[in-house]
Structures are given as C-alpha cells and as structure tokens.
Regions:
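Catalytic toxin/effector domains delivered as secreted proteins or via bacterial secretion systems
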Residues: 34-181
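HINT/intein-family self-processing domains that catalyze protein splicing or autoproteolytic maturation
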Residues: 1-36, 133, 144
C-alpha cells in the first residue's frame, strides 16, 4: 500500500471518503488504519498454467478455461476470499447473472459505463446491480478486465466494451453455491 497521492481514472466521489491504492493498482475504499491487512502480499500473481489448473479443478474444459483467462488484461492474481465477504454483481435483472464474475464495488454510474468497464456480453444490459456474499472461503481470481471488441460489434449498441475495470472470479457463483444474495 502507498500513502502517497496516486492518480486514479474513471473514478467519481460525491463526498469525503478515504481511499488507498496498493502497488497492484487495487483501490481500497474506507480502509482507514486497518488497510495494512490488505497489502499486496495477500495477492499471488499466477502463471497461465496455474490459472488453468485452478479452473480445471473447478470443472472447466480447456476452451472455457482459455476464454476465462482471455477475459483478463494482464496478470491474474489469486487471493483467498472469506465467507460473508461482499461483492457487487452486474446484471440485466436482479437474480439473472451467475455470480461467477463479480466486482468489489459498482463498475460505473450508468449501465453504459458498467458495460464498457466490464466489457460485458451483449446479453447483459447492466441495468441492475446487486450485492452478493461468499457462502464459504474460496480461492478468488482477480485482475483487470480485457477489452471485448467482438462483443461490441455483435451488440451494435455503440458501447466499445473497452474493459479496464477490476473483476473477481468466484468459485462457480450460484451454480456451485459459492455466493448468495
């Protein structure tokens, strides 16, 4: 973590809040003096092979694992998530999304910002945001969202799907009992 001022993009605050940025670029809201527990040593950068091993253990085939890896722009980090830890899920309607992909906070003020920052597929309108909690401790995969220009072409809605948000991959979302609403 750093206590030095850091430039942050795509970020809006309406009131006074305390934020800290770690060397991995993770923005931590209202961490206060306890932010030392969120230091980068809690994150382990993984190789593609290590990510594939984790995803194979979760039941993904080679192509599904590669597609998930390709949804990241840059390094993929592993971190232990704890039961009760809360995340935001972005979906068309409350209850529709799987919860495999979540975020720490909202990925944008408008649905257009959320679609762009998370490079969402054409079937996710991002009109709803809900809070979900982890049902158990689990390994989370985290990193920066990659651009999805092919989805922008398919959607034909003028949203470029540039990515750049921070995504968290749970251990299967609602399909594996990893999250609850």
């Amino acid at each position: 973590m750093t206590d030095e001022p850091t430039t942050v993009y795509n970020f809006q605050v309406e009131d006074f809040h305390t934020y800290h940025v770690c060397t991995l670029g993770v923005l931590v809201h209202n961490a206060g003096k306890n932010y030392a527990s969120l230091e980068p040593d809690k994150y382990t950068e993984l190789t593609q092979s290590e990510v594939k091993d984790i995803l194979k253990e979760r039941g993904l085939d080679e192509q599904a694992a590669q597609n998930l890896i390709d949804s990241f722009d840059g390094p993929i980090y592993k971190r232990e998530g704890f039961k009760g830890e809360a995340f935001t899920i972005t979906e068309s309607n409350a209850g529709e999304a799987s919860g495999v992909f979540v975020t720490r906070e909202s990925a944008g003020i408008t649905h257009t910002e959320r679609i762009n920052n998370l490079a969402l597929p054409p079937n996710n309108t991002a009109m709803a945001e809900s809070t979900v909690q982890l049902t158990r401790s689990q390994i989370l995969l985290e990193g920066k969202v990659a651009a999805q220009p092919d989805w922008a072409v398919i959607a034909d809605d003028g949203i470029p799907r540039s990515g750049g948000g921070w995504q968290v991959v749970t251990d299967g979302g609602k399909y594996n009992g990893a999250i609850e609403r």
